[in-house]
Amino acid sequence: MGSGIAQVFARSGYDVILVDVSEDILRRALQSIESGPYGLIRLVEKGKMSEEEMKKCMQRIKTSTSYESLKDVDFLIECVPENLELKRKVFAELDKICKKEAIFASNTSGIMISSLAVAVERKDKFIGMHWFNPAPVMRLIEVVRGAMTSEETFQITMELSRKLGKVPIPVNDGPGFFTTRFITAWLMEAIRLYELGIAGIKEIDEMCKLAFGFPMGPFELMDLIGLDTILHIAEYMYEETKEKHYAPSPTLKKLVFSGYLGDKRSKLGSKGGWYDFFQVKK
């Protein structure tokens, strides 16, 4: 997700510093931005961008494995895995490094913003900015105000989202916000229907697309997002709400524990997703 967000910012004329834990991951991120399924080369091929514009766009993106490279940024977006303690640790370290004026935004898909903001001093400059996959294509950004998010931080984030060509919609803080609460229940129910033998993976995907006009079905969507991410979200939602429709599916756990983390093109080290594990032809 981070590489897609970086692509959106760079294409909108912003200088970007992309930070990750290894040079190999960063190399793959740049490769995805340039030649991935939603990359810049595709835009050139479709006539939506010139080769010169693509070159300038790529030049706006710098990479680093050090948090020190972020010390002068104005706006920071965190995209680490959906793990509360990991996110808090990252923000606590960044809070010591980044200038005090910098706004911190989390791309968490469901962890309460107020529970993340406890890790930093700048609670008034902390906000949720929930993007959707694939970031270069999906227009919605869910903007989440924490308990101490200032009006200025909120307005800056809303306006920035619009400048990026996105549609920001404000929501209140709570486990899963709106979209994740809604979609997690849908995804877990789709898996349960498969487990009950009501319909197959491909058939469920096709019915959701044909009946509801969705661009992709639940199993295709889970493969795109990442099955490990979906599992983390479901576990968090169930732990926070104790509502049974969020309970993680045993089948989902089996795939994740077997190394099937989703689409191999976007998930480093994954053996594949639902269609690969069950050998279903698309």
Mark where each language-model region is:
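A non-catalytic, amphipathic alpha-helix used as a structural packing/dimerization or gating element
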Residues: 24-35, 86, 152-163, 203-206, ...
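A general alpha-helix detector
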Residues: 39, 139-140, 186-190, 217, ...
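NAD(P)-dependent Rossmann-like dehydrogenase/reductase catalytic/cofactor-binding core
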Residues: 12, 155, 162-173, 195-196, ...
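NAD(P)+-binding Rossmann beta1-loop-alpha1 motif at the extreme N-terminus of oxidoreductases
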Residues: 1-37
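Rossmann-like NAD(P)-binding element
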Residues: 21-28, 41-104, 111-112
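Rossmann-fold dinucleotide-binding core
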Residues: 103-173, 180-181
